Amino acid sequence: MPLTDDVKRTIRDVPDFPKPGIVFKDITPVLGDAALFRRVTEAMAAPFAHDAITHLVAIESRGFIFGAPVAQQLGAAFVPVRKPGKLPAARQREEYSLEYGTDALEMHADALGDRARVLIVDDVLATGGTAAATCRLIERAGGSVAGLSFLLVLEFLHGRHALAGRRIESLVTF
């Protein structure tokens, strides 16, 4: 069976989570299948295998799960982007808008060099706000974003619009 079919079949729908009317796409069954998880991370890395990626930036927290093995496969440095106050050294910060209010992301100030060629990895592309803020953070730090790789894209939330002009790869869409 093709990988996309295996992933779609394995992701669990959880109705009314985290609130009524929402159908949550639970990726933990994908993580629970070691062979499938390996295939997924290999497939997330493959489109960027010849792009001279120097750094992989993963978005807290599920992006870390996929990002670490993808970074290893690409021979790239792993850089976590975290919620404020979680990183111990000097940090750069990027604020972004939410439906009601703002949030922020941080990255160590010395995590990237001026010639860093970066792949961003996360589990889900929804509205694109977090991913767009991560792109801005990387570019402000002197890096260039080669692309973004997601396990899945929720197309009905139009996250690709927030990342217009960026290379986006995903294994499945809903």
Predicted regions located by residue number:
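Residue-level signature of catalytic and energy-coupling elements of molecular machines
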Residues: 21, 56, 78, 148
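Phosphate-coordination loops involved in phosphoryl transfer and adenosine-cofactor binding
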Residues: 53, 114-115, 165
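Conserved G/P- and acidic residue-centered "switch" motifs that form tight phosphate/ATP-binding loops
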Residues: 123, 128
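Short, glycine/charge-rich flexible loops or terminal/linker lids adjacent to PRPP-binding catalytic cores
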Residues: 76-119
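Short Gly/Thr/Asp-enriched flexible loops that form oxyanion-binding sites at enzyme active sites
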Residues: 65-74, 135
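Active-site-facing substrate-recognition patch
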Residues: 1-53
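PRPP-dependent phosphoribosyltransferase catalytic core
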Residues: 2-3, 9, 132-174
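Short glycine-rich phosphate-binding loop at a beta-alpha junction
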Residues: 53-60
